[in-house]
Design a protein with these regions (language model features):
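Extended catalytic-interface subdomain
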Residues: 21, 39-40, 54, 58
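Active-site-adjacent bridging/hinge elements
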Residues: 28-42
Length: 237
């Protein structure tokens, strides 16, 4: 996703994702066509491959998706609280997700249902980028949800002057938003109704001033096809 010099600098700061290997394992599971819901009892998986990837690769990805949704601070404090409240006990998956909801102030059962009880995948893309009426000097970006699983989005816009602005799009069903994670300018826009396949993001900037647009440049979302997550409008010289 780090296609311009400025974005590469930002991504170097966010590099070293310890979940990259788990994400590759999950990707191979999806591409194999053998994936089964994580909630399947271990003895009832059709293949050992699907069981192993679900238990280890997708299990690690699950935690990283929670981290992405609620933010680093809430995730860390939630994990510590989970350990303190449930050590030497027998928690269920619902005990974990309820604790994370309390810690973050968000509704998370939708994520748990999609990621654990189904094999629906995450896949977002930039469908189109167009200038609006010249009088307004704004730009319209149409985003599309190709996969069946919804997620909140971090959309980065790099301008020709080298500055970067993040547009954060919550999912309506989560009833909340994560705090900012960096020092770049950040705008929280209207939430995305989870049943809608497309979303229009209007930028208060003319098309000529935009160099590139990226969905999830930190590459934390378990997007099964991120080739459509970047649109470069003006190439660097």
């Amino acid at each position: 996703h780090c296609v311009t010099r400025r974005q590469r600098q930002m991504c170097i700061r966010d590099s070293g994702n310890p979940h990259a290997g788990s994400m590759r394992g999950y990707q191979r599971l999806v591409e194999s066509g053998k994936e089964e819901p994580m909630a399947t009892h271990a003895d009832h998986y059709h293949t050992n491959f699907a069981y192993g990837r679900a238990a280890y690769s997708k299990g690690a990805v699950y935690l990283n998706q929670i981290r992405y949704i609620i933010g680093e601070e809430a995730f860390r404090s939630g994990m510590l609280r989970y350990h303190e409240e449930w050590k030497l006990k027998h928690p269920t998956d619902l005990d974990f997700i309820r604790l994370m909801e309390k810690e973050s102030g968000m509704i998370l059962d939708w994520f748990h249902e999609y990621f654990v009880h189904t094999t629906k995948t995450i896949d977002y893309g930039i469908k189109s980028v167009d200038a609006t009426e010249k009088e307004t000097g704004s730009t319209k970006i149409e985003l599309e949800r190709i996969g069946l699983m919804p997620m909140p989005l971090d959309v980065w816009v790099e301008y020709t002057d080298g500055s970067i602005e993040e547009f954060y799009i919550p999912v309506r069903i989560m009833r909340g938003e994560k705090p900012t994670e960096h020092t770049e300018k950040r705008t929280v826009v209207a939430d995305w109704p989870w049943v809608e396949p497309t979303y229009t993001l209007t930028l208060p900037a003319s098309l000529e001033t935009i160099r590139a647009i990226s969905i999830d440049p930190s590459q934390r979302i378990a997007d099964v096809n991120n080739t459509n997550n970047v649109r470069v409008l003006i190439s660097e010289q």
